[in-house]
Amino acid sequence: GADVKIEQNYKNGVLQSDNVNIMSRSPIKKLVVMSEQTTFSKVTVTIKAFIDERFAKARCSGAAVHKAVLPVSFRFADSQAYQGSIGIEGISKELDKLVMENLYNTSSFVTRPLVRANLNTSNSPNMSNAFQVSNLSSLADRYGSQYIILGTINSVSTSEVGNNVLTKLMYVPTRTINFDIDVYDAINEQIIFHRNYTAEADWPFKQSEYIDLRSDRFKSSEYGQRVYGLAAEVSKDLVAELQCKPANAKIIDLDGDDVVINVGRENGISPNMKFTLVQAASMSGPNGDNYSAYEKSNSVYKVVSVYPHAAKLHPVDLQNNTLNVNVNDVVTLQ
C-alpha cells in the first residue's frame, strides 16, 4: 500500500542532493532496507514499509477476508520454450516450489495445495473461450477457491557468443528467465491479473551441463539470484492485487431463510459480518454460448454461525428480503 521513491543525484561521484518521498493512504510506522544489489549502471534496493494495519484495514474491507487461491503448476508456453531449458529442465518445478513457499507465507491468502493440471488456457489477458472458462471454473469449485494462479514459462534460453575464440574468452554467455503470471477469478469468470516477469543474467555453467537447481552453486549464481528474486516479486504483486479485492463467496446451501456460503473460519469470517446478496443468472449469447450475469440486490445478510470452511448467514431484514435466493448466488462483504 505504500509507494516509496528515493532520488539521489551525483556529480563526479559526489552526492549533490538526497530526497525521499513516501506516498501511502495509511501511516507508515518505519522503513527497513531489506536488500541491495549493485551492478555497473545502477543500484537496486528493496525496502519494506511497515504500515499501521488499523488504518489499512479500515480503508480496505476486503483485507478482512483471506482469499482462497489455487496455484496450478508452471507449464512451458510451447515446445520451443521447453527446448530452451536444456540443463535446467526442472525449472518449472523449481518455480512451483518458490512461488508456493512465498504464497504459503502470505497471511492474506488461504493457499490450496499445488495442482498439476494440463489446462488448455490462453496466455492472453482477454480470455473469452467458453471451454477454457468452464475448465477453470470447474477446477476452482473442486478445490474451494475463488482465484486460480497460472504460470507460463516463455523462455529460459541461453545466448550465443559465437565461435570466435577471443570472443568466447572475453564474454560469458547469458540466460533469460521469462514467464507470465495470470490470475483467474472464478466468480467473475475472467482473468483479473496478467503480468510478465523477465530478467537476464550471466550463465557461467557449461552448455551441456545438468544443473541442480537447489544446489548452493546455482543459488549463489547471478542467474539463480534473479530467479529467486522474480519468484518473490510474484507473491508481492499478488498480495497488492488481491488483498483489497471485494470479498465474495458463493451460496452452497439454503436452510429456510438462511444461506450457507463457501468461506469460513479459515478465511477469517467471524460472527456479525454483513454481506450483500448478488444474484446470478444464466444468459445466452448470440452464438449460443452460455455465460453468467450478476445483479446486486438490497438484501443484507449477517453471519450467525461460522464453520471451518463455511458460514451460515441470516437476513438482517426478513420483511424486505429477496425471496428467490438460489445456490450459486453470490454474497459480497459490506
Identify the function of each model-found stretch.
Residues G1-V14, Y82-T152, Q190-H194, S270-M273, ...:
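N-terminal segment of the mature soluble domain
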Residues G1-N19, Q225-D237, E241, S270:
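Short, well-ordered alpha-helical segments
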Residues Y171-V172, N178, D185-L230, N287-P308:
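Short secondary-structure boundary motifs at beta->alpha junctions and helix caps
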Residues M23-S35, P71, M127-L166, Y171, ...:
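A short, hydrophobic beta-strand-centered structural micro-motif
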